[in-house]
Amino acid sequence: MPYYNRKEYPKQIWVSEIPEREVSLLRENLAGIKQTTFVLIKKEEAFHQLSEKRSRDIIFLSSNQSLLDLARDVDVPAIAYQKPEMDTFLHADMVVEGFEEVDMTFLQRVYERHFNIPWTILETKRCIVRELELSDLDALFSMYAEPGMTDYMEGLYEYEEELEYQKAYIENMYRFYGYGMWLVFEKKTGTLIGRAGVEHREELNGDMELGYAIRTSFQHQGYAYEVCQAIMQYAGEELQVHLLHCLIQKENALSEKLAIKLGFSYCGDREIDGVLMSDYQIEW
C-alpha cells in the first residue's frame, strides 16, 4: 500500500549571514514550533559544520552564495535570502526576498521538494490529498482497472510509458507550478480512492480546470464533493485562483450533478479532441 500521508520535517534550521531584522521575523513565524531547532551560526562555523556534517536533518538559510553552494554539494536543502542591494542573483532550492511568508509549512515544502518527498496538499475529514510519487503507479493501475473508471475519461498509458509520463509530470508540473492532478487517499484505510486537482488548459485560454475522478467502488459516498470543496478553497487561498472550469462529457450526468452541487454553472459547449464537452464555470 502507498504511503498516503508521509510527512518529513527538518530537525534543525541553520541560519547564517541573514540580517537581524529578517532573523527576528523568521523567529516570530516559527514561534511555538517544537519539532525543529533554530540555530544561528556564523559564516566560518557554517563552512566548517557543513563540510563535516552530511545530514538529512538540516535546512540551511543564507545570503552567502559560497555557503549555499556548499550546502548543495553536501545535499542539504537551502533557501537563499536575496538582499535588495545585491547585484547578482543567488541560487538555491528556493530564493526569497523576505521572510514574511516563510513559516514551518514553507520550510517543510522546500525540504520535501529537495528530497523528492510528495507534498501533502490538504486533508479533509475522511481523505488525504497529496502529490503522486512513482511508487503509486501499481495502485493507480489497480484503480483504473475497475469497471466504469474510464467511461468518461482517458485511461492510462502502458506501464512503462505511464512511468515516463509521470516522471515528467512530477518534474514539470509539481516542481515548476506547485499544483496539478493529485491523488486522493481514504484516511481510514490508506486506500487510493481517486484523483483530483487543478490544471491550466490551453483550450480554456490558460484558465484553470478542476478535475476529479473517484474509484468506482467508492462512488456515491460523498468523497468527490468533500475533496473538491477543499480543493476549491485551497485554489482560492493558496493559489489565488478564483475562476475554475469543469469540462464534462455530455453523457456524464453524475459529474454534471456534482459540478452544480459545487456551485458551477453551465456556460456552453466546447469540442475538445473531437469530444463534445459541457463547460461549467464558477467565479468567486
Where are these regions (language model features)?
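A short helix-loop-beta-strand connector motif used in the catalytic cores of GNAT acetyltransferases and
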Residues: 169-183, 194
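Structural motif
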Residues: 14, 59-62
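Short hydrophobic beta-strand segments
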Residues: 6-20
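Aromatic/hydrophobic pocket-lining residues that form the small-molecule binding cavity
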Residues: 23, 162, 228
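Acyl-donor (CoA/ACP) binding surface of acyl/acetyltransferases
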Residues: 2-9, 28, 32-38, 47-58, ...
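Short alpha-helical segment
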Residues: 45-47, 162-163
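Conserved GNAT-fold acetyl-CoA-binding loop/helix
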Residues: 148-169, 179
